Amino acid sequence: KQVFVIPDPTEREEEPIIFKPNPHRLNAVYYGSHGNLKQIDWGQYDLSKVNLKIISNEGPIFWDFKIQGEFVRQSDLVLLPVNNDHDMTQYKGNNRPIDALRQGRFVITNAMIPSWQLLQNFIWCGDINEGIKYAINNPDEVIKKVEEGQKFVRNNYTPEKITKEWERVYNVCDTWDS
């Protein structure tokens, strides 16, 4: 029998793209579970010109849907480093970068996660330090990537689109012999 993989829908409304960074002091936000957060070696990144806010279920800023939205709106971009060597990393969904794109923000990540690689035309997937430099030096390209990313999310991750995927799966499964 067939196997179906259906992504999570985005829960966020699409917001305007805003990217006018101060190259001397970027505002950035990270959000993720404490389990993800404790796997990150922040010391390997040059964050000397980055005012980073960290949101997780155990703090320092405690996660909640509304809080995350507010901090993303205050940021120039979203930093989402991951530990690519951790066994579970490869199986993560792409809800975190999708959320950022939906809110009109560029994502910088080092993720090699297959679901995140689907977004590589719209987010930075590679060296975090190089991604920060790229964003500062290429604001027009960043805006274009986020515009295209929002279109991709709109076409693939809205509740309406995901509902249609579930209906398709239901209809296929409904034809199987028990």
Task: Give the ranges of each region predicted by the language model.
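Conserved catalytic-core segment of nucleotide-activated headgroup transferases in glycan assembly
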Residues: 8-74, 97
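Nucleotide-sugar-dependent
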Residues: 65-102, 108-118
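CheY-like receiver
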Residues: 71, 131-135, 152, 169
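Helix-loop-beta element that forms the nucleotide-linked donor phosphate-binding surface
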Residues: 1-9
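A short helix->loop->beta-strand "cap" motif at the edges of active sites that frequently abuts
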Residues: 1-2, 103-105
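Short, polar loop motifs at secondary-structure junctions
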Residues: 1, 53-58, 109-114
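A charged, aromatic-enriched C-terminal amphipathic alpha-helix characteristic of glycosyltransferases
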Residues: 13, 139-177
